[in-house]
Amino acid sequence: MKWIVTEIDGKVASIAGDYRHLAGIAARIAAHSPDAVERIATRKITTDELVELGKALRWEDLCLYGSKFQKAVWKALFDLTHPVDGEDACHFDQAKRVEKSPLMSYSDLAARVDNPQGVRAVAHAVALNPVAYVIPCHLIVPKESVDKIHEIRRSAEATLFRGSDLYLLDSISVGEYAYGPEIKLELIKKQLAK
């Protein structure tokens, strides 16, 4: 699969499998003065190049159009795979159920953005994510799958496989994704292999 990267003045505004986000960005910037944007560029990259780009980008390298709430949800997702304040990526507070895996449910993410009752609003913000993989919406999986992962981990703690991930991604449901569950599974595997 080829990914389309759209940059505005050198900052990544979208990464997608089609041009729909570019059309949305064009509509947003059309409301501004022509001087507001110096340069808009697009390029196509492979999934492996996307993984490398995802490692290199910082939050400040993104040019995002969305509401304050959407940006808060996207930032929480971004923080799943990018170190925050000296933390290791994918290592968070046990109270938020994330443990060392970046896979989480919509309700887990809603709790992370301090809006546990706003699961639907969080799901909507995730669906509008303009920067695939870098803002890793593909790491949101059904709650049942997250629960299964945690149960396997608890069982593993009592064995000599303590701390190992015994679950196979192929054995859990990864849920829906704009580009299909096969692409989502591929992105999850690449993310976890980092």
Protein language model features and the residues they cover:
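Short glycine/serine-rich loop segments
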Residues: 116-185
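Basic nucleic-acid-binding alpha-helical/helix-turn surface characteristic of O6-alkylguanine DNA
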Residues: 1-116, 150-168, 182-194
